Swiss-Prot record:
It comes from Acidovorax ebreus (strain TPSY) (Diaphorobacter sp. (strain TPSY)). Specifically dimethylates two adjacent adenosines (A1518 and A1519) in the loop of a conserved hairpin near the 3'-end of 16S rRNA in the 30S particle. May play a critical role in biogenesis of 30S subunits. InterPro entries: KsgA/Erm, rRNA_Ade_diMease-like_C, rRNA_Ade_Mease_Trfase_CS, rRNA_Ade_methylase_Trfase_N, rRNA_adenine_dimethylase, SAM-dependent_MTases_sf. This is Ribosomal RNA small subunit methyltransferase A. It is found in: Cytoplasm. It catalyses: adenosine(1518)/adenosine(1519) in 16S rRNA + 4 S-adenosyl-L-methionine = N(6)-dimethyladenosine(1518)/N(6)-dimethyladenosine(1519) in 16S rRNA + 4 S-adenosyl-L-homocysteine + 4 H(+). The keyword S-adenosyl-L-methionine applies. Its main location: cytoplasm.
Amino acid sequence: MKHIPRKRFGQHFLSDSGIIDAIVRAIAPEPGQPMVEIGPGLAALTQPLVERLGRLTVVELDRDLAARLRQHGQLDVIESDVLKVDFAQVAQALNAPKIRVVGNLPYNISTPILFHLLAHVRVIADQHFMLQKEVIDRMVAAPATSAYGRLSVMLQWRYAMENVLFVPPESFDPPPRVDSAVVRMVPHEAPEALSMPVLEELVQVAFSQRRKLLRHTLGRWLEARQFAGTFDTQRRAEEVPVSEYVALAQKCS
């Protein structure tokens, strides 16, 4: 029986074999590597991955799809909302210090998923995700550009990222109304040590009114914390590079 894509899960299934091959080449799976796929759907990407890996763990929320996937002898199925999955526990279950994570992420919750994985980054070797191209543009954006924001700062602090493949809407069934792309995310080996909640709060405050100078937003936040250091608040949030936000978070941690 044909599976009808569910709008509430943001389901758009990959159907272009050329694009699927290109994604698998970008991921470059090796036999025996511990890998987790988020949102395997109809297994378009799952099958070529598991053929190369030998075994694959998948996270699927849709009950009907999870039941189908369980019939595959080489898949370990976690039927769950990915935002509730403890990836440290998954790595432990796979007896792996670090796991590779891949997926065609549901576009309606892609940012929460990225932040959830950020909290588990210590057990992640790398990530390859299909996302809305506009989201990837924000992830890799440079300072002083309109795409640069909270997502750019939080992810660039912890990952080296690159857009590795453009994916047009007609590669999916049903086609989304947006362009897509594949991003590669490799955690930095020696990231700057800081309190992630402090960086998150600091960046959220800074970009809360991005048109205003930081003295109206972040300046007040720093005053409330009795910050005694120096930081130029006569700038807009988008003008401050990641390294300066990180240094400020370290001083406030």
